[in-house]
Amino acid sequence: MDLKRNLPLAGMTLVVLVGMAANSLLERAGLAGPAIGPTLFTLIRLVGGALVLAVWSAIRRVPLKRPQANAFWLFLYAAAFSYTYVVLGAAMGALLLFFAVQLTMFTGALAGGERPTASHIVGGLLALAGLYILVALQLHRPAPWAVVGMLAAGAAWGLYSVGGRGVRDPLAHTTSNFVYAALLAIGLAALRLSARGGPQTMPQLSGVLEALISGAITSAPIYLLWYALLPKLRTVFAATVQLSVPVIVGFGGWMLLGEPVTARLAIAGALVLMGVGLTMRRTGQKASRPDTPAPDTPA
């Protein structure tokens, strides 16, 4: 294994996962209380991310691409997650979201010609088991519409990720996705305002800031890096490694907030790491062309 070649890739993957975990914490803080509603949170998040990427693209003189399906998947993920998270809560939401992500991306891997081995399947199941152990005590019987909504959010994120495998210009594609997703969010907000006859309550500054930080800092740059990484990773590995996000959130609470490390968190973390490790075996990265030496699996 060429450690020098794999360290940058592993480091960038870790940055993406930590960014996703930070985004999860921001959304939890913003949507858990009355500071901001899901429609406005989604709007500010996507518009904030679009503005950051548009400025970056203008500086780099990268033209805006035509809208593609990935822009819709990004919008659907952001909107469905925001609306259903309010009802489901963190534990049930995480379980349903990442289950749908796994199923969608494994299906995408098969459709794309990848052939997961037994170790990949066992790894994915182990990581899912770790996630279940982490959230099991907080599960409840949710509203059926919220379950469907969160599964739709997970499927949309899975499709958005699968759609990034063949991207050659991550900045151009991510900017386009955010710009057109933001336009869809503006349309959604206009429909909601029209249906209600105007805003019902004014958002609090804290909620607006959390949505803006979520979009401009922990969404747009992180998703750009994710699109830069996806062509270098096997879809199976990319799907399974995301199951570590709730575990990172748990350990982040220990490091930053002084929350205790419970036996459930430790066991869940171990299972997720074991599962991710199994999906890294031999096929952590996409197979290279015959004339190109295949890089090693990141570790």
Features from the language model and the residues they span:
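Membrane-interface helix-cap regions at the ends of transmembrane helices
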Residues: D2, G48-L64, A79, A127-A143, ...
